[in-house]
Each structure stands twice: as structure tokens, then as C-alpha cells.
A protein has these predicted regions:
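Class I S-adenosyl-L-methionine-dependent methyltransferase catalytic core
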Residues: 1-248
Length: 248
């Protein structure tokens, strides 16, 4: 039955049939009780915004869903949203800007890259102070050294690049330093959304979401499905459990 369904979808939608199948297969989890944001996020179709070729970036729909939730919550309780501000302190290719522009809210984008696509460059999350406050801070750090950014994706190697930490303990210490700094930059009633994943390094499993610092009230735990990963087209003989989720 599934093989026949796949044939029908491919005949109707061509190369996009897998994306259509993924969207249909996850819809029952993505939408419940009239809500567009549930504890399961899945965006097989990435959407427009940022640079899809920038390794490790997330779908702008992730940021948009979190932003929409925060705006809806403020409006429900009769709070003003005219000065709502979204801050992304590791903005990469500028994905968060696309989400902010969609909802016509102010966005602040920082990045260690001296020449980012948008926002303030050469901003060091370990040493520089956050120059403003925000209602929503979306923090999507490197997953340790899975993808090294400085000297690879941009510029030259930087000693304060979290993707170039010597080991996981060093990475976690610096990650938690950033979390503390960003939490203190929140406005009253603000939210810090952290998107992280799990990884295997030299055969050992590391869970960032389990190890990172938690500050304030823990509002929700969201599981996000991963799609269109570089490793999707590889096969491995050794038995292991593939990592196909991230967490916010």
C-alpha cells in the first residue's frame, strides 16, 4: 500500500513528492486542538528566508512559529506589541530577519562573522554585551564542532567561535555562559528559545538539551524533526540509532 501511495504521489508531484508525503505524515502532530504550534515541529518544506545553502541553519518557519506564539500570547492578555523585539545573537545567514519581517516586528541580528548577511557583525557572544533587550531571543548555537563556521563557512578561524571549542566540556561551559547572558537581556515577560540537537562524537552520544543550563521558568519542550540533512543520502553498516530530531 505504501509503495503504491508513493508511486501515485511521485506521478502527481514529481521530485517534490517526498516533501508532500512528509507534510501529510506529520500534520496530525503539527496541528492539534486548533493550534498551529504544538510540542512537535516539522517543516519538510523549508520556506523562504535566510540562505538554504548555509549549513546548519534552520527553517524560517521555526522562528516564525515561535514569534507568532509570543505575539498571540501578548495580544491575548491585552499587552502592547508595537515595540516587540526579536533578537538573534548568532544570526548566521539572517533566517530570523525573514520571520520578523513577516510579522512586521523589530529584529536585532548579531553574529561573530565580521561580514554577516544582515545585522551587526564581529559581535562576540562570549565577550561583548547585549546592547538592547528583547521580548524573544532565538538562540541557535553551533552543535559543538559538527560544523565549523569560522575559517570554513566564513572568514578565518576565530578563538571564540563555539564551533571550534577544544572539547565538549569547553563548549558546554561557553554555551551556558551565553545562555546566562541572553536570559539577562530579556524584557519582563520575555522568552528565550534555544534550538539545539544531539550528536555523536568518537562513538559517544552527547545530548545538548539535557546538558545545557536552564534559567527561569521552563515553559515547554518542543521536538523538531530534521529534514534534508547532508547525511540523509549516506548508508552505514554499523548498527546505531540515527539522530533525526532537534529540540527547542
Amino acid at each position: 500500500m505504501l509503495h503504491r501511495a508513493a508511486q501515485l504521489l511521485e506521478a502527481e508531484f514529481g521530485p517534490q513528492w517526498r516533501t508532500v508525503a512528509d507534510m501529510l505524515g506529520t500534520e496530525g502532530l503539527r496541528k492539534r486542538v486548533g493550534k498551529e504550534l504544538t510540542s512537535f515541529m516539522a517543516y519538510p518544506e523549508r520556506g523562504a528566508g535566510g540562505n538554504s545553502q548555509w549549513r546548519g541553519n534552520c527553517s524560517p518557519e521555526v522562528v516564525a512559529a515561535l514569534l507568532r506564539y509570543c505575539l498571540d500570547d501578548k495580544r491575548y492578555y491585552g499587552k502592547d506589541t508595537s515595540t516587540f523585539t526579536l533578537l538573534d545573537p548568532m544570526s548566521g545567514s539572517g533566517t530570523s530577519k525573514a520571520a520578523a519581517d513577516r510579522y512586521q516586528v523589530r529584529s536585532l541580528l548579531y553574529d561573530l562573522n565580521p561580514a554577516p548577511a544582515y545585522g551587526k557583525g564581529n559581535w562576540n557572544a562570549l565577550k561583548d554585551e547585549v546592547e538592547d533587550s528583547a521580548d524573544l531571543i532565538f538562540f541557535h548555537p553551533p552543535y559543538h564542532n559538527m560544523i565549523q563556521y569560522s575559517g570554513n563557512i566564513w572568514g578565518t578561524p576565530h578563538p571564540d567561535d563555539l564551533s571550534r571549542c577544544e572539547n565538549y566540556s569547553d563548549f558546554l561551559e561557553k554555551l551556558n555562559h551565553c545562555i546566562r547572558k541572553f536570559f539577562l537581556a530579556l524584557r519582563k515577560g520575555g522568552r528565550l528559545a534555544i534550538l539545539v540537537g544531539d550528536m555523536r562524537l568518537h562513538g559517544k552520544f552527547y545530548s545538548m538539551q539535557n546538558d545545557l543550563m536552564r534559567m527561569g521558568d521552563f515553559e515547554s519542550f518542543l521536538v523538531k524533526g530534521q529534514f534534508n540533512c547532508v547525511s540523509d543520502n549516506r548508508t552505514y553498516k554499523k548498527p546505531f540509532i540515527p539522530i533525526v530530531t532537534e529540540y527547542a
